[in-house]
Amino acid sequence: QNAETQGRYLKTFTKHRESGILGTAYYEQKERQERVMTQKRIRDYGIMPGRIKTGKRNKITDVPGVRVGHCTVKEGEIHTGVTVILPGPDNAFLNPYTAAAYVHNGFGKSCGLIQIQELGTLETPIALTNTLNVGKVWDAVAEYVLRQCENDGAEALSINPVVGECNDSRINRISLRAIGAGQVKKAFDAAGEDPEEGDVGAGAGTICYGLKGGIGTSSRVIKVGEKEYTIGVLVQSNFGATEDLMVDGRPLGREILEKYGNEAEDPVKKTAFSEQDKGSIMSILATDLPVTDRQLTRIIRRLGVGIARTGAYTGHGSGEVMIGFTTANRVPTKGLRR
C-alpha cells in the first residue's frame, strides 16, 4: 500500500513538474535559498558595526514569528518589486500588534500611518514598494486580509493596510506601475525566516548614496534584567548623496568620487554619483520587547540616528519614515464590529 501511494505521489509530482505548476515554485525556492547562502554581508568584509551582539541570522526575522517575502520584477525598463513583512503567523486584524509610526521627514506617500499613530496598533502585514504602486499594493493587502477574515469566519468592515514606498524612477520605468495583486501574492507566498537582501523586492530599483541600494536588515540581542530580547530592523534604502557616504567612520563616498568620479561617463555621473540627499528610506522595526506604543515611538525615533551615522543629513527630498511593532503585546479585537 505504501509503495502504491508513493507511486501515485511520484506520478502526480512528475505531472506537475512537467506542467510547470510545481517545478517552477520548487526551483525558484531552491535558487532563492542558494542566493541567501552565498550572499556576502558587511561583516564578511571585516566591518563590524556596533558593539551589541547580533541575532542568529542578523535579520529582522530573528524576532520570533516575523517573516519577510519579496517579489522582484526585472523586464526591459522595469526594475522594481514588492516586499512584505508579516509580524506573525495568525490574522493580525483579529489580534493586532502594539505598534508605532514616526515620520522623520514627510516627503513620501505611505499609507496607514495615521491610524497607527492614533491607536497604537498594527492590524495588517506591512508592504513596501515604489511610489506609484502604493494604491495597487494597498488594494492587494486589503484583499489578503479580507480573505484571512473570511477563512476565520470574521467580518472586516474597515481595514488599515500599511504600505511604504520609495521612488525608484531613476532606474525603473515607474509609470508602467508593474506591481499588482499577482506580485503581492508572490511576495506573501515567498515569506520566510531567512530572506534575501540587496537588489530584491522593493529594493530592486533603489539607489543609495549614488550606488545600488536595496533591502537591508539586521538584528541585535539585548538584555533586560535576566531576560534577553531581540530588536530587528529592515530598510528599503533609496537616499543619500555619494560624497556624504560614511562606512564605519570612514568617508568612503568622497574616496569613491576622488578615485572614480573623473573616469565615469556623464550618464553614470548623473544617475549614480548623486549630488543631493534625496530619495527616501523606509525603516521597519520589530521586537519582542513587551513595550507600549509610546515606548515603541521612543525606540523608532532613534532609527534616524543610525541613518545619520551612514552620512545622511535628512535632505528636503528624502522621505524618512519609521514603523515599529512588538510581538509581545497584542490588542485583541475579535468580536468587535470594525
Model feature map: region roles:
Residues 4, 12, 21-29, 33:
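Short, positively charged and aromatic/hydrophobic N-terminal segments
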Residues 37-338:
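Alpha/propeptide regions of enzymes that mature by internal proteolysis
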